[in-house]
Amino acid sequence: MSDYTVGEDCFTELPAALAEYGATKVAIIGGKRALAAALPGIEAALEDTDVEVLETRVYGTNSTRANIAKVVNSPACQEADVLIACGGGKALDTVKTAAIELKKIVFTVPTICSNCSAATAIAVVYNDDGSLEGYSYPNRPARIFINPKIIAEAPAEYFWAGVGDALSKQPEVEYATSAGNLEHTAGLGLALAHTCSEPLFTYGVQGLEYVRLDLSTEAVKQIALDIVVNTGYVSNLTNQNDY
């Protein structure tokens, strides 16, 4: 499972996280708006360290083979020890998929929380016309940095979409595993799926109200954790051929 750090000061732990992997060179890839939101905090955290940012790259607008190839073919991404992916699902999935070929460690910075891509070992790949091509199966991100302030200041519709996505996780997993005879890992996933719904009912309405006001609060943090971490862990535990 991915390690994660949550809080408005989450990027202060970035140097130590990179040091755990012996990483001194990084490439930062994301959407244009995502980089505008996350880059100041990342750069401030890396200032006066021995970590070198080789490149900051706008990935494109969709997780297509063409955009994935641009990351794969980037000399900076090839040289980097860690790829730091910033954005929503499409940006994160682009970097996660590119990392398969590059054999790189990925850190994720979800700047919206419309889904659990920041934590999962699966990625969606689209055709150039926006239709679904299929899926890739990267390693799960090594570390997630969740900044509730960035998420609260993103458009509220993404937060609302994430609530819906997380709300579907428990019944989805219950149905997929209803035949029983679960392996231990899938059983863990089913148990964890039962933790996904309660935070949404407890904090969802309040969290959405605060996001509409661009305010970072405990409710926003709890919903972001549920959408990204709880459901992401469930996905990784139950993403098996039989389910």
What are these regions (language model features)?
Residues E8, G31-K32, C86-G88, V109-I112, ...:
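Fold-independent oxyanion-binding glycine-rich loops
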Residues F11-T12, L35-L39, R65, K90-T97, ...:
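Short glycine/serine/threonine-rich phosphate/pyrophosphate-binding segments
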Residues G60, C86-G88, N239-Y243:
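Active-site nucleophile and cofactor-binding loops and adjacent substrate-binding regions
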Residues P75-A98, L102-C113:
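A short, small-residue-rich loop immediately preceding and capping a beta-strand
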Residues L102-C196:
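A glycine/threonine-rich phosphate-anchoring loop and its flanking beta-alpha core
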Residues H184-Y243:
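Active-site segments that bind and position negatively charged phosphate/pyrophosphate groups
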